[in-house]
Amino acid sequence: MVTIEPLAFEQLNIGDKWTSADRTVATADLQSFADLTGDHDPLHTDSEFAASGPFGRPVAHGLLGLSLLAGLSSNAPAVLTAALVDIRGWSFSKPVFVGDIVRAVTEIIDLKPKGRRHGEVHWYRQLINQKGEKVQDGILITLVSRRVPLPNIKTLQSPTIGSEVANLEVIGQ
C-alpha cells in the first residue's frame, strides 16, 4: 500500500486538476445504500418494477452517485480536509446504472484563506461514466487545514515544583 501525504491549503492552486481511480457500480451498492438511507424505492431495488420505468432497469439513487464521487475524490487529491461546508449547483445530468464504471474529476476553482488554521477550497467536481459522459457535477466547498508551523517551544526547569511537573512548555516565546 502506498502512503499519500495529504496536501495542506497552501499547497493547492486554482486550476489544479485530478482524476480518481475507476469504480464499478454494483447491485450490492444500490441495496446497501437503500438499507443505509431507508430509500427502498423499487426504481432502485426491484429489477422487475424498474423494467417498466423510465430507464428500463434499476437506476442508482442520485445521492449514491454523489456519495461515490465523495469517496473517489477523497484521494484525488488527498488533502487535510477539516469540513464540508457547502454544495452548490449540483446537477444530476444522466442516470447511473449497475455495471457503470465511474470516476471523479476534480478542479480547484477558488481558494479563500479563512484565518490562521484553515482555508476554504471551492472544488468543481464531476462524476464521469465509462462513456466519458458527465452524469453529475457541481461545486463542493470544504475547509482544508493549513500546515501551521510548530510554535517555538522552550522547556523550563523549576527548582521549586515537584519532579512530576518540573518541565513546563512555554509556547510562542
Model-found features: residue ranges?
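Conserved interaction-surface patches within small, structured recognition/assembly domains
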Residues: 88-90
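HotDog/MaoC-like acyl-thioester-processing domains
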Residues: 1-13, 92, 96-101, 105-173
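Hot-dog-fold acyl-thioester-processing enzymes
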Residues: 2-86, 147-173
